[in-house]
Amino acid sequence: MTAETERIGVKGGMEYSFGFTKIDEAQKQSMVDGVFHSVAENYDKMNDILSLGLHRMWKNSMVAWLSPPAVFHWKVLDVAGGTGDIAFRILNASRQKAHATVLDINGSMLSVGKKRAEKNGLAPLIDFVEANAEHLPFEDQSFDAYTIAFGIRNVPHIDQALREAFRVLKPGGRFLCLEFSNVEMPLLDKIYDLWSFHAIPKLGQLIANDGDAYRYLVESIRKFPKQDDFAHMINHVGFSRVSYRNLTGAIAALHSAWKI
């Protein structure tokens, strides 16, 4: 394993890598934007490929752990949630009484989400905001919950995004992050590596005509911090009661924390 392929630690460093490629910090955001402009229309298919179809079950687990109340004026911010997948689940779990704000830096992803919200009759319950997770355009203590699924590994400065999450949450607010993680079962890890590095780029080329985008997504998963390291990063910005659950042999992990 080389320095380029090692996972980052608690001190961060994702801003200097585009997958396994070392880059200048200033390049990171525009390069990631290019990936998601490319895959926006096929985003659910992309997650099906990356997770072997398991992402739907994991997202349901995330919303179940959040347990959104069926009360009006309860507000959730879903970051990097452009297509609305998490927000729709949360709204339905709250019996369509909660209000969701979906924030994404990528306009193509938001466009997909807006169309889906209108199609599903959820548009009145959702605001779509194009902005950066590192600089949220909201006042302090604005939300009851902050969710982010398969997005934080694409943020250049993860520590800054976590600080912003803490800032905009109300006291007693909940943070939940679902992300691909460090597989802890050796045999499963080998099988998943074979799938990821050999099959996924080829399928990405076939389905979305962009194998390079899918190769980046696979490599970015392998660069993301291990579960305990990410938990430490969450705790470091001020969150309390930080915990995580491994999902499907730790192919993914769900981190939870509270602002107390």
Swiss-Prot record:
GO biological process, one term: menaquinone biosynthetic process
Recorded catalytic activity of this chain's protein: a 2-demethylmenaquinol + S-adenosyl-L-methionine = a menaquinol + S-adenosyl-L-homocysteine + H(+); a 2-methoxy-6-(all-trans-polyprenyl)benzene-1,4-diol + S-adenosyl-L-methionine = a 5-methoxy-2-methyl-3-(all-trans-polyprenyl)benzene-1,4-diol + S-adenosyl-L-homocysteine + H(+)
GO-annotated molecular function: 2-methoxy-6-polyprenyl-1,4-benzoquinol methyltransferase activity; demethylmenaquinone methyltransferase activity
Swiss-Prot/TrEMBL keywords: Menaquinone biosynthesis, Methyltransferase, S-adenosyl-L-methionine, Transferase, Ubiquinone biosynthesis
EC number: 2.1.1.163, 2.1.1.201
Record-annotated membrane-spanning stretches: none
Top-level EC class: transferase
Domain of life: Bacteria
PROSITE patterns recorded: SAM_MT_UBIE, UBIE_1, UBIE_2
Pathway assignment: Quinol/quinone metabolism; menaquinone biosynthesis; menaquinol from 1,4-dihydroxy-2-naphthoate: step 2/2; Cofactor biosynthesis; ubiquinone biosynthesis
CDD domains: AdoMet_MTases (cd02440)
Binding site for S-adenosyl-L-methionine: 83, 104, 132-133
Family membership noted in the UniProt record: Belongs to the class I-like SAM-binding methyltransferase superfamily. MenG/UbiE family.
NCBIfam families cross-referenced by the UniProt entry: MenG_MenH_UbiE (TIGR01934), PRK00216.1-3 (NF001242), PRK00216.1-5 (NF001244)
Function of the protein: Methyltransferase required for the conversion of demethylmenaquinol (DMKH2) to menaquinol (MKH2) and the conversion of 2-polyprenyl-6-methoxy-1,4-benzoquinol (DDMQH2) to 2-polyprenyl-3-methyl-6-methoxy-1,4-benzoquinol (DMQH2).
Name of the protein this chain belongs to: Ubiquinone/menaquinone biosynthesis C-methyltransferase UbiE
